[in-house]
């Protein structure tokens, strides 16, 4: 299991056994890098999946309610990603929420 950088270049194809987890998908990170920086956005994303109630000071009440259900779903369905490579447009040298998903799967594997 590894992170793949998805590309928009002509002829690029996503490898077999790879799941795109970018922003428009149900696995996307709602915390924007432009607002928080990459490290903080990834950290909050991971914390929200681990402990759903901890991360809503950055959101208004309506958005927090929506994201609560979304992160709850992610925590309950994380195993769907096991054994897949995860693709996102983030540079491989930058922090990415796909790495957080991979880390969480490794943690779940140990318990």
Model-derived features with residue positions:
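Catalytic phosphate/metal-binding cores of nucleic-acid and nucleotide-processing enzymes, i.e., regions
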Residues: 1-111
